[in-house]
Amino acid sequence: MILRSSIAETSEPLPVSAAVLQRSLLNWYDRHGRDLPWRKPPDVLDPYRVWVSEIALQQTQVKTVLPYYQRWFDRFPTIADLARADLQAVLKAWEGLGYYSRARNLHRAAQLVMERHGGQFPRTLAEAIALPGIGRTTAGGILSSAFNLPLPILDGNVKRVLARLIALPVAPAKALDRLWAASEAVVSLDRPRDLNQALMDLGATVCTARKPACLVCPWMAYCQAYQTNQQQQIPVSEPKAPIPHKVIGVAVIRNPQGQILIDRRPAEGLLGGLWEFPGGKVEPNESISDCIRREIQEELGIEIAVGEELIVVDHAYTHFKVSLHVHLCEHLQGEPQAIACDEVRWVTLAEIDQFPFPKANTTIIEALKQRFPDA
């Protein structure tokens, strides 16, 4: 299907005046905006709270973030508290939200805010973007919400709304300049905080990816995708490559005292700084048991006996999927060495909840607690 756009690339970025779009959207928002804690005083006036909410909402749904929000500030009430916290405590507080680089960046950025800005979140776009984990749209979201500055945003919801509004004939990733121009044109000088939040709410509740509720949309009369009956085809999606699937052998290694061996991943990279049960990828024509023995010898320098299967955990990351085949194992000989990790520890099952683990590993922990209820 050839998509049609009624707006030439060289013309105005919006199909009607910004004032018309602002008025209709803000009227809708005043009646239907979502009731979220980071939008209410005093939180909405606190850039630290807005900042944490913006980071947590990256690639994570609101309903998932809500239970974490107040717990985070109970643990780290101020930027100074976060900056001086141990990274392991920060990762533990983030446990379950995923995309742990966000927590590491929050921690490092808090330290930089203390060092460079006297503990006050910066008020300029350039200074905000200079902090780890903050790009243009996150900075715009923080500064427009906390300080009511007229800055555009372009998260996933807003891209979809604007792509439909202007009937964007190509995938959003191929026309970011046009979408930024549209977002900048539509932002309100009088109510930028509310306008940006209204855009996000419109995408989250009305202009959804599937089955958009066009008949109740405040922009229905101006939406070029709706007017040309293309709302189901826009935004244009690009073909996705097949997602690789990895089979992983995982060892829950126990010593005669009933302790369990865990290791901490390197600080950089996927799941950096988190603890896990050791193991690795199954090679072609290799059994799960042989994989586990080989990986433990290579990574920790010890010999083990591979026992019964405890659980199989299927988990999806952004760019690949894994199946973790978890076996109970017995430590035979050798002192564990941190060869391919940053640290190793023997811990009891009662102590294990003190350490931050990836979500897939927390499933293993629950299986262990059921298997050894008296440990």
Where are each of the predicted segments found?
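N-terminal strand-loop-strand
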Residues: 230-276, 305
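NUDIX/MutT-family hydrolases
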Residues: 328-372
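Catalytic cores of DNA base-excision repair glycosylases
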Residues: 2-4, 17, 28-215, 219-228, ...
